[in-house]
Curated annotation (Swiss-Prot):
Source organism, top-level taxon: Bacteria
Comp. bias regions, Basic and acidic residues: 31-58
Family per record: Belongs to the UPF0337 (CsbD) family.
Protein name: UPF0337 protein SAV_738
InterPro entries: CsbD, YjbJ_sf
Annotated region described as Disordered, given as residue ranges: 1-58
Amino acid sequence: MAADEKAQANGEQAKGKVKKVVGGAAGNESLKGKGHAEESKGDLRAAKEKAKDAIKRK
C-alpha cells in the first residue's frame, strides 16, 4: 500500500470515528451519519490499496 494512500485512509477512518462518537454523544444524527460515511470511505480506500498490493505480488 502506498504510504500516502495508507495515511489518507487511516486519517479518514479516524476522523469518521471521532465524528460518530461526538455526534452520538451530542445527539446530532447528521454528524453521526457523516462520521459513518467518512469512516466507510477510509475503509474502502484501505481495501482498494490492499487489493492493488495483492495484484502487484502476483
